[in-house]
A protein has these predicted regions:
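Multi-pass, polyprenyl lipid-linked donor-dependent membrane glycosyltransferases
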Residues: 136-156
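Start-transfer (signal-anchor) and selected internal transmembrane alpha helices
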Residues: 1-31
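Transmembrane-helix signature of polytopic, membrane-embedded enzymes
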Residues: 113-133, 151-152
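Membrane-interface transmembrane helices that cradle and orient dolichyl/undecaprenyl
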Residues: 154-177
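Transmembrane-helix motifs of polytopic, lipid-linked glycan transferases
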Residues: 96-122, 156-160
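Helix-to-loop transition at the C-terminal end of transmembrane segments
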Residues: 30-51
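Membrane-interface alpha helices of multi-pass inner-membrane proteins
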Residues: 173-190
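Short hydrophobic/aromatic helix or loop-helix immediately within or flanking a transmembrane segment
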Residues: 65-89
Length: 190
């Protein structure tokens, strides 16, 4: 017996389409509100080590090539330079990057859910998990934003791979599929 679902529909109606676009944006707004109200821009925990190691000279590559896994991630090095030069080293900058990265991952889930015509109730459940309490804790801790960004990149890679596998690839999908793993692994995973 076959159960009816959204996959049987040829077109997702307008209300569902809006929900797929709106929930990741609402999640971002919620995370930014949470960061504003639950944390202050003060150096603590992981950041004490980062401040002592990097702030005197953020352009020094010798400080980048050390044994610490969090500091060897190239995207962290780049964001730290931007943070120091434009914001005078603000912890909130890293937290906002984390919120944006979680929302990018949620957007990838939304795109994949639209592509597969996932039932809207399941999509809402995915979004609840995506913006759940474990993300809030990691956001206020701060330095884990690059991990959220890596998740978003991996999810995007899965979307492209699935599209290619089903024979629905777009013009640049094959090229991006060949380059993206290198960029993800070397840029966001160290």
């Amino acid at each position: 017996m076959k159960l009816p679902g959204n996959r049987d529909k040829k077109i997702i109606d307008g209300t569902h389409r809006i929900v797929f676009y709106l929930l990741p944006l609402l999640g971002l707004a919620f995370l930014l509100w949470y960061i504003k109200n639950a944390a202050c821009d003060v150096v603590y925990s992981d950041y004490i080590r980062l401040v002592n190691s990097y702030l005197p000279d953020v352009f020094n590559p010798e400080k980048f090539f050390v044994a610490d896994v969090l500091t060897r991630i190239p995207i962290n090095y780049l964001s730290r330079i931007i943070n120091v030069k434009f914001f005078g080293f603000s912890i909130t900058f890293d937290r906002v990057l984390g919120a944006v990265s979680v929302s990018l991952a949620a957007w990838c889930f939304a795109a994949y859910s639209r592509q597969l015509k996932i039932n809207i109730k399941w999509f809402i459940t995915f979004m609840i998990v995506m913006f759940s309490l474990n993300k809030w804790e990691m956001l206020t801790n701060g330095s884990g934003w690059s991990h959220f960004f890596a998740f978003a990149c991996f999810y995007y890679h899965q979307i492209l791979f699935d599209r290619y596998y089903r024979g629905q690839e777009r013009k640049w999908d094959k090229t991006i599929l060949m380059l993206l793993p290198w960029l993800i692994i070397l840029g966001t995973a160290g």
